[in-house]
Amino acid sequence: MFSSPESERPLAAVGALSRSRGVEHRGQTCLAGRVQGVEQKRDGSDATAILRVAEAEIGRDLRQQVQALLQACFPGYPSRSYFKLPPHFRYLAMTSGVLVAQMGVELRVIRVGSTVVRTFGVVDLCVRTSERSHGLAGRLLAEVTELARSCGVDFVILFADDGRLYTRGGWARAANPCSWVKIHDHTTLGLATAEDTGSLMVKRIGQQAWPIGEVDLLGHLF
Ligand SMILES: CC(C)(COP(=O)(O)OP(=O)(O)OC[C@H]1O[C@@H](n2cnc3c(N)ncnc32)[C@H](O)[C@@H]1OP(=O)(O)O)[C@@H](O)C(=O)NCCC(=O)NCCS
């Protein structure tokens, strides 16, 4: 299995966006620059807005909410808003100005065997306990899938021990050998390899079949 240290925790995440709507969200000035959002009706009178936000444009207040949600959802999560390195963008689900779900997404070119493929890697998908089992995570995964299609991304990949949510969304286990860069607390430790991570899941977006061969993540584990 994993030759990486305990600190190398496989995580999953997701996101996506469809219709573009402006930058303002309940007057939150912490969201500077390009933000896209989709209003989502909930059972009651309230609505959850799903936003796609570039990581660099997330302001301090919202970043603190992200960190608090991650620490609440993942026991032992470090005291920052990302596990290894910040993702490129996130999907944020906001209800009444409060962050209720989030998913990080990284644009990563990886090599599988001799084939170089363009992927979105999903990390740290999580939903506030009180909001679970209402399809929110599934919705974020559907959004990132839609974005991947519109961006010509070949695959959306993630690492998950529990595959239920993802199998339902069209992901499948992939048993390729895998290698990645071990990073712990901003220090590069070396290279990790696994014959089969047991947790890699892949969703095909385009016409290309998932290749045979070793997966070289060309970076850290998602
Ligand atoms: C996993 C999680 C994001 C699901 O969010 P959600 O909004 O409740 O998801 P959905 O409503 O779209 O789907 C719920 C289904 O996901 C599946 N599921 C539950 N926990 C899961 C988990 N940890 N991993 C994968 N699938 C899970 C179940 O089949 C569940 O169905 P149920 O509600 O009938 O039991 C949420 O439970 C969570 O934040 N867990 C803690 C963090 C975590 O484990 N994230 C996943 C990292 S890979």
Residue ranges, per PLM feature:
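A short, internal acetyl-CoA/4′-phosphopantetheine-binding micro-motif in the GNAT/acyltransferase core
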Residues: V122-R132, D161-D162
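Conserved acetyl-CoA-binding loop-helix of GNAT-fold acetyltransferases
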Residues: V127, S133-E146
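Conserved active-site alpha-helix within GNAT-family acetyltransferase domains
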Residues: S150-D154, A160-H186
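A conserved beta-strand-loop-helix scaffold within acyl/acetyltransferase catalytic domains
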Residues: V53-C126
